[in-house]
Amino acid sequence: VAENSKGNGGIFGWLARLTRQSQLDFFPVRHVLTDYDQSKLRSDVLAGVNVALLAFPQGMAYAMIAGLPVEYGLFGSAFALILGMLFSGAKFIVLGPTNATSVMLLSTFSTLGAMTLAQKAAVVPSLLIMVGLFLVVGAILRMASMIQFVSRTVVTGYIMAAAVLIMVNQVRNLVGFEFSPEDRAVSFVDVCRLTFFKLGEMPWGEWLTWYPIVLGGVTVGIFLLLQKRFAALPNVALTLVAGALLHWLATRISNSDLGVAMLSSPEAGGLSLNIPTFELEQMRMLIGAAVAMGLLCVLEGLSIGKLLAARQGRRLDANQEMFSMGMANLGCSVLSGMAASGSLTRSALNASSGAATQVSSLISGLLCLGGVFTIGQYISLVPKPCLAVMVMVIGYSLFSRKQYRIVTKTTLSDAVVFWVTFLTGLVFALDFAIYVGVGASIILYLRQAAAPHLVEYGFTEEGQLQELEARKRTDMEISIVHVEGELFFGAADLFLEQTRRFCADPNLKVVILKMRNARHMDATSCMALEELVRYMRQSEQHILVCEVKSDILQVMTKSGLRNLIGGDNLFEDVSTNPTMSAAKAVRRAREIVGTDKMKVSIYVDSFKQKKSREQEDKKSTK
């Protein structure tokens, strides 16, 4: 045993081989620093300052969305930027808290029951370390491509449900009330119910009740004006400063605090090492949210990263970026941060500001971190209603009419998946909505892929293909069946049923299956085809298989189907001569039938045949 362990390296040798096979670079920033010069530094400093001016107030807003102290959003923004720069292979993705992950945190806290601020903060490290491990392990196993199974329709439904929850959940911070510890606001429905109940208890006859609403309305007006006139400025930060000044003037004029809650400044000891607790029951409750949050991080980050990389003619290493997100979340788990994902707005701003390398993220992170310790004490001067309305504006910005139109008007399947995800996100916890949406999209896809439609075609006197009317064959015939699409387990029974239906004609003697466009044959489809062969032999009919590609042939060989069909009745595809395999099959069919006078019918997928005709018509009109 000792020799065996020594020979193969044991667990450490296996891990070393796995990391080599992952093709990850565990310190990619060294490639940037080797030829770093002054011109790149100037570009990175400019971009870094611009991103920091946006990331700082957004970090506060995302902390409020999640129901955490503001320092979690600020430290999360800073350390995600710094760690992301160290492990990212490109400059395109700027990491930090986002709307999607903040709402996921809020939803996770809600499912855990009544929690104080300290209890929520205690859960974050355990949750983030699970998210980070999920992303790191996924990157090592090169699983970034698996994200394609979460469709953009699911993400759109989730984002819009999250936007609604964000806006409704900020009503309490705007008006000035809190839910009791016994209230469980798990979903949008719960938040609406509790909010309406609390609004009914407010003393609307007193003018102080209306003051925070008026202050919030004026704050929104200032922001919209700044956005219209000075869109290039850091308007979120400027608006919060303006709101704080307005409230300060109002308190001086009225000589009272006006009963408005203020934000709390980051605590002096807010930055500390948080050691996650690994309790089995807590991990069981958090695992679903951790996986969903990990999927969201990769989806958000890779979406904006691939877009920005394509604009510059570059290619994004998805697994490397997934690894950087994982390391950022692991770092934030012990450094009082929030979940780190790829930010759409900050990534776009970084690119438009002319960032030369990922060093711009390092500069942004250091500026945010410095801002916490220099101007962090002044955060307590910002009224909660001002930040609440800015969060509402951010939530409203998530609605996209274009995306809504695309996912609801393009296909019925997309519309169903969108509404299922959206409504589930309103009624249940948001992480559950992602799983339901993914499940619905996969089920609808399988239904489409598992529903082949075979239509009989024949040649007219002019030599044109046309659909044949239902009739009895009068001569011995050969039927050529074009097998196209997926031959996985979901399609096997339907294919067998439809094939047996036309094989029931006693005048039919030979069926030729053309397998060139068949894909992903599995054990279930092999057993279905085996059943078809035995059924036809009992009816003294023959089945030939042609244009069999190497992967399909390998499956047939391993399953024993190749021997059952027989070497004389199976013809491999010849890539250099596409028609040779089918010609051999027709020649073999003539030998079986024993005459050259026979009527040949062809079966194809009606939808694909129609699509092919449409493409040919388009070519002929050009």
Over which residues does each language-model region extend?
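Cytosolic C-terminal regulatory domains/tails of membrane transporters and channels
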Residues: 1-28, 453-622
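Transmembrane helical cores of multi-pass ion-transport proteins
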Residues: 2-460, 475, 560
